[in-house]
Amino acid sequence: DQYIPYRDLFGGVLNEFHLFDRLYGLPEVDEAGLNQWLRIMQLDHKTSFVDGRFTNIDLSTGQKARLALIIALLEDKPVYVLDEWAAPQDPEFRQYFYEVILADLKEAGKTVFVVSHDDRYYHIPDRILKMEYGQVVDIETAS
């Protein structure tokens, strides 16, 4: 087969997601690598990953979204879709996400679709797709 099923290409965090203290559906997970992601996402003071479990998942909405993103990134997909992911983040982490994390994902060769209404960061993406009523009405390319 020369075609890859589309589900193998995409990962993401959509508006509704569920967290569990264990990881399901992932092959062997490197605890040190996962704990490094917790540091990057500024969650290492709230939880850690020990013996195949998160020590705490009683987190704020923004922190839960960060943990969900870490889990999605562990799948190592080439394309990610993040639906209003940054909305529940505090202002400092939201800026860090747009300016650092997205740049790191781009450098790693990942394609990331970020659904956002936050125009403070519209200068960051390579392209902006404007949509109205579910239809693309304009595509802007970074200058």
Regions found by a protein language model. Give the residues of each.
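H-loop (His-switch) and adjacent beta-strand-loop-beta switch element
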Residues: 117, 124-142
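Walker B catalytic motif
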Residues: 82-90
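Conserved catalytic loops of ABC-family nucleotide-binding domains
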Residues: 101-118, 122
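ABC nucleotide-binding domain signature
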Residues: 4-15, 113
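Conserved "ABC signature" C-loop
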Residues: 12-54
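Conserved hydrophobic alpha-helix in the ABC-type ATPase nucleotide-binding domain
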Residues: 6, 96-101
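Conserved ABC ATPase signature
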Residues: 53-63
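GG-anchored amphipathic helix commonly corresponding to the ABC/SMC/Rad50 NBD signature/C-loop
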Residues: 61-82, 96-98
